[in-house]
UniProtKB/Swiss-Prot annotation:
Name of the protein this chain belongs to: Fumarate hydratase class II
Compartments, record wording: Cytoplasm
PROSITE patterns in the cross-refs: FUMARATE_LYASES
One of the record's GO molecular function terms: fumarate hydratase activity
Any one cellular-component term (Gene Ontology): cytoplasm
Pfam families: FumaraseC_C (PF10415), Lyase_1 (PF00206)
Pathway per the UniProt entry: Carbohydrate metabolism; tricarboxylic acid cycle; (S)-malate from fumarate: step 1/1
Similarity annotation: Belongs to the class-II fumarase/aspartase family. Fumarase subfamily.
Root EC class: lyase
Disulphide bridges, residue numbers: none
Cited function: Involved in the TCA cycle. Catalyzes the stereospecific interconversion of fumarate to L-malate.
CDD domains registered for this protein in UniProt: Fumarase_classII
Domain of life: Bacteria
């Protein structure tokens, strides 16, 4: 491999000749050989959005030469297109302020932008700190990139996946709204409802989760940029934060604003913690939905078996013909991971000391992982399971007919205690509810048939 020599305030460093990063990126690569968790590409792209916006804001304020600003913006555009993805090699496990990832972007942009200017016969050079990082600190850029990355991830990945699953389940709810089945509470038989009503509960969970996620995501639209080192804004123009936020808004199509209190923006990550709490709520709902699906599909002969789900792959290496609810299993594991991520984020967010929280990389890494897993998990569950959910009408009817809880319909007519006598006798002697009612001489057959109609038990009755 060929190398070139780069320099920083600590001296010379050998850097791969085919890469645009500089000395500080190389030092980070050598000093933090920890794990395989790279800084998420969404953070890299958010930094490109930010550096493009800061260059244009500095240009508007007269703090950066127009030629330099345009060269920086051009390189950032290429980064956003994925042209230099292999120039961002750093892991999450680095300085807690994210300084090395900030400098990684500064160095790549500066070196490539300088090369662009040379191609245009310009004698200007672009410095990673003085030009690309002008009016900025890692302490305000990294939290800004965190918020930009988080908001875009929610809207570009999570919301489409959530909407798709929600809409398909809504179609199922409407299609199966006339199929009366037995309800279950405490894992025991309960009064009837329709399969459509049961699924409609899942739909409403997803609707509420989306509402909570979007409301929480709005909290992350306030950006730290302009606070520089400790929140005072030293070395930045008073209007810098607002101008950068305007540029980011233009570029992304999402509304961002300058945080009203930069001291809070640097040292606290309560907003992203709050937003991840909404992701955890979605994970809890998905855990419940996936569990319901696999319980309802359990069997095929000795389980509940009231719905049929797609058979995607063999389920056992020893039991021939076995097929398992693998999409539900994958989704429940994802939900467990999101709950673990929430614990990590909550603890990390509590560790802001004085003017700066230095757990930033692990916070955004876990947040973006949660969005990725939830999005991919919902897409997979949708494509390989939800679209193929069908009712097993024969089993549904058999379970409904055998349920003792249909006796609840008799409460208004013969009272709770007499209804309980019927249920207990039926259970003890293996009778139907009708047979037990007749044996106890509490009702005639005609009265029982008129009072116990499962289809009339699925809605309120005056």
């Amino acid at each position: 491999m060929e190398y070139r020599i780069e320099r920083d305030t600590m001296g010379e460093v050998k850097v791969p000749a085919d890469k645009f990063w500089g000395a500080q990126t190389q030092r980070s690569k050598e000093n933090f050989k920890i794990g395989s968790e790279k800084m998420p590409m969404r953070v890299v792209k958010a930094f490109a959005i930010l550096k493009r916006s800061t260059a244009l804001a500095n240009k508007r304020l007269g703090n950066l030469d127009a030629e330099k600003a345009e060269a920086i913006a051009a390189v950032c555009d290429d980064v956003l297109k994925g042209k230099y993805d292999d120039n961002f090699p750093l892991v999450v496990w680095q300085t807690g302020s994210g300084t090395q990832s900030n400098m990684n972007m500064n160095e790549v942009v500066a070196n490539r932008a300088t090369a662009l200017l040379k191609e245009k016969n310009s004698d200007q050079t672009i410095h990673p700190n003085d030009d690309v990082n002008r009016s900025q600190s890692s302490n305000d850029t990294f939290p800004t990139a965190m918020h930009v990355a988080a908001v875009l991830a929610v809207y570009e990945q999570l919301v489409p996946a959530l909407d798709q699953l929600r809409n398909t389940l809504d179609e199922k709810a409407k299609a199966y709204n006339d199929i009366v089945k037995i309800g279950r509470t405490h894992l025991q038989d309960a009064t009837p409802l329709t399969l459509g009503q049961e699924i409609s509960g899942w739909v409403h969970m997803l609707d509420r989760s989306k509402e909570m996620i979007l409301e929480a995501t709005d909290k992350m639209r306030a950006l730290a940029i302009g606070g520089t080192a400790v929140g005072t804004g030293i070395n930045a123009h008073p209007e810098f934060g607002e101008l950068v936020s305007e540029e980011i808004t233009k570029l992304t199509g999402q509304t961002f604003s300058s945080s009203p209190n930069k001291f809070h923006a640097l040292t606290s990550h309560d907003e992203i913690t709050y937003a991840h709490g909404a992701l955890k709520a979605l994970a809890a709902d998905l855990m419940k939905i996936a569990n319901d699906v696999r319980w309802l599909a359990s069997g095929p002969r000795c389980g509940i078996g009231e719905i049929v789900i797609p058979e995607n792959e063999p389920g056992s290496s020893i039991m021939p013909g076995k097929v398992n609810p693998t999409q539900s299993e994958a989704l429940t594991m994802i939900a467990a991971q999101i709950m673990g991520n929430d614990a990590t984020i909550g603890f990390a967010a509590s560790q802001g000391n004085f003017e700066l929280n230095v757990f930033k990389p692990v916070i955004i890494y876990n947040f973006l992982q949660s969005v990725q897993l939830l999005s991919d998990g919902m897409n997979s569950f949708h494509d390989k399971c939800a679209v193929g959910i069908e009712p097993n009408k024969e089993t549904i009817q058999e379970n409904l007919s055998n349920s003792l809880m249909l006796v609840t319909a008799l409460n208004p007519h013969i009272g709770y205690e007499n209804a309980a006598k019927i249920a207990k006798l039926a259970h003890k002697e293996g009778l139907t509810l009708k047979e037990a009612a007749l044996k106890l001489e509490l009702l005639t057959e005609e009265q029982f048939n008129e009072m116990v109609k499962p289809e009339d038990m699925v809605k309120p009755k005056a």
